[in-house]
Amino acid sequence: MIFPHHHQAAVSWNSSLDFGTFDFIIIGAGAGGGVLANRLSEILEWNVLLLEAGGSPDDFTKILGLSAYTYYSTRSWGYNVTSQKHACLAANEEKCIFPQGRGLGGGTTINGGVYVRGHPEDFDRWVSVYGNPGWSYEEVLPYFKKSENALFEPRDSYYHGEGGYWTVDQCLSTPTVVDLFKPLFKEKGIDFIDDYSGKYENGIAQYQMSLKGNERVSTYSAFLENFTSRSNLNISLNNFVTKIAINKATKTAYGVYFVKDGVNYFAKAKKEVIVSAGGVNSAQLLMLSGIGPKKHLKDLNIPLVKNLPVGQNLQDHVMFIGLIFRTNRIFYNQTMAEMLKLYEENQRPLMTGYSVELVSFTNFGRNQTIRPDIEYQISTPPPSGSQFEFFFGINDSFVEAININTSSDINLFIYLMHPKSRGSITLKSNSPLDKPLIDPNYFAEDEDIETLYRGVELILSMNNSQILKDYGAYIVDVEYPYCESYEKFSKDWWLCAIKYFSYSTFHAVSANRMGPDPKTSVVNARLQVYGMKNLRVVDSSVLPELISGHITAPVLMLAEKASDIIKEKYNRH
């Protein structure tokens, strides 16, 4: 059952209408909440309420190649980071955009659709470094496989599922791009691999995409759309959740306050309230409900329920977008209408988000047993340079520096996989209507920018390759504004360029970190909020640290495992 309608924000907890009583209330229908709603409602005697702030996806969101256009729409919360000191300097007010999904499917309806699990070491560290039993790679692999329906070939069936709801596929890459970059990376000791979600992640490969036919796969299309007829699954759209109802004496969560159609409602939970509002909003909601750093809540006159480091330890991948390869080949020179026609025929460039072609996960030691330091994303550019600037929110004064020839250029984005820097999510005020303050604190640790620079150096070392010359290709000489005081192409010049043209990837993790100690963590290994009863968090905010890649696949796994943890607790496993 789906309850639609639109809300107008009005906040009051004193006069709320009764919305009903449910066994489980799930806040947020994104990568975590969508999976949970499906799996928990498999138990017919459980009555599940899924509260979503946005509405249903439309046909526009099905096209991965148009994903960036959703960032400034009602399908996103419209967030920016706070002004950064060491990154985002070419963005308006030094504030990178930080889109977070809003609507059924959450971020899975607006992201680039890339499917990356990470390196086995990532999950083994969850156990060995962060003290979370049950989350090693071998223990979570069955949950990656459970949701997956892998269609691409070749693949190793030991590592892949073939009957799950989430379809993973590859689309044909542009031959010239593959033929150029495969041998170029091979010269640097980086081999082509068929499947980075298989035995080895490190190498250069085609991207695996959340793609079914030519349409995006989201938690809406995979886990919700075909299950709305379940009488025990209640999906309510356009709800603005303002607070979790908590019995302060017993520290028990028993319901949720929210606004719908300008009316204040209260829904009661008999078993659990599960917060799956996303990497940013879950931390915001916990703090508004009195769970968070004692001093911060006191400063905002929010009554303290539980002192926990909510909002601390925020991490995000940061990427450098300033490297462009120019070739003498024409890739795509069509109008948008012509590209949409190609899309209908299952052809590029709109088949993938950001027109991604190839990916390389690389560690500098070339050791497959060690997780990568860097991700290289190789893409053809969007249909026009102005759209490139639009995607990243680049300040007008920097537009000319990124001078893209959209028909013949190749973008190479460099992601820092494992930053040492830690940021925070804090509240601007005690009002749910105020956007949270998101500070990823990029490059606060010098080691981060040094590692990213090493990633740049590796690509620069390709510039004299005969392979490039054979394609009439070269790395574009970008004139980075405000870096003229440094010797061109010197290390300091590149460090300056990185600070100006490094951007958010919107992979918000760890603000409600999972771990064994409530002094440094918010939830335990069973995703229960410390010191609280009947309250869990299941989304990217509980990941102990960033994984080696994008975060949708790990959150799907997390929610699959969380569903079994919950079923086991109530003997319904």
Language-model features: where?
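N-terminal redox-cofactor-binding region of secreted/periplasmic oxidoreductases
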Residues: M1-H573
